[in-house]
Amino acid sequence: FLPFLATLLSKVL
C-alpha cells in the first residue's frame, strides 16, 4: 500500500 497512508495512520495512532 502507499506509504502516505501509513503516515496518516501514524498521526491517528
Curated annotation (Swiss-Prot):
Keywords: Amidation, Amphibian defense peptide, Antibiotic, Antimicrobial, Secreted. It comes from the Eukaryota. GO terms for biological process: defense response to bacterium. Expressed by the skin glands. The keyword Secreted applies. Belongs to the frog skin active peptide (FSAP) family. Temporin subfamily. This is Temporin-1Ce. It comes from Lithobates clamitans (Green frog).
